[in-house]
Amino acid sequence: MKRILITGKNSYIGRTFIDWVEEDNIDYEIDTIDLKNPDWKKQDFSRYDCIIHLAAIVHKKDQEDAIYYKVNRDLAVEVAQKAKNEGVTQFILFSTMSVYGMNQGIINKETKPLPKTPYGKSKLEAEKGIIKLQDENFCVSILRPPMIYGPNATGNYNRLSKLSKKINVFTKINNQ
C-alpha cells in the first residue's frame, strides 16, 4: 500500500483526489496536513512514500508580494527538504502554467518560463529550489496545470462559465 501525504488539506485538488481514491477503492493510505500550523514540522514524514504538495497562496489581490514567496517558494522548499531528509522517495509539486506568463502562445517543451505575477514568479522559484533536491533516492515531479475546474471548484471558472452563457461570443482558436 502506498502512503501519501497531501499538503494543503483544504485544497480543491486534494479533496477531489481523496474522493477519487476512496470512490475507486484504490489501495492508498492518504493523510493531509495543514501547513498553517507550525506543528507540521514535528510530523514524521518517514512513513510516507510520496508527498503531494498543494499548499499555496494563489491569486489574492489584497496580499503583499512577499507572502507569495514565503508560502509558494520558501515553504514548498522547506517541505521538500524535510521530505528528502526523512526518506520520502517521491515529491510532487503542483506549480502552475502562470510560470509561462500571460502573453505566451502555444506552450511546448521548448517554451521558456517568463512569469509576470508574484504568483507565477514564486512558483517558478519553488520549482528551481526543489528540483535541486532531486537525486537517485528522491524523485521530484513538477506539474504545471492550467486553470483547475470541476464540481464545486473555487476560483474563476464558475464566473467565466456564467459569463460565457450570457455572452454569445467565442473567439476562434486554432487548438493544437
Task: Specify the residue positions occupied by each region the protein language model found.
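N-terminal Rossmann NAD(P)H-binding glycine-rich loop of SDR-like oxidoreductase domains
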Residues: 3-23
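SDR active-site strand-loop-helix element
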Residues: 7, 51-55, 91-97, 143-145
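Adenosine-cofactor binding site in Rossmann-like domains, unifying the SAM/SAH pocket
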Residues: 28-43
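NAD(P)H-binding glycine-rich loop region in Rossmannoid oxidoreductase-like domains
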Residues: 40-85, 99-102
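Active-site segment of SDR-like NAD(P)-dependent oxidoreductases
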Residues: 58, 97-100, 104, 113, ...
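Conserved Rossmann-fold NAD(P)-dependent oxidoreductase catalytic core, especially the SDR/UDP-sugar
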Residues: 78-118, 133, 141
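Active-site helix of classical SDR
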Residues: 122
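NAD(P)-dependent short-chain dehydrogenase/reductase
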Residues: 139-142, 146-176
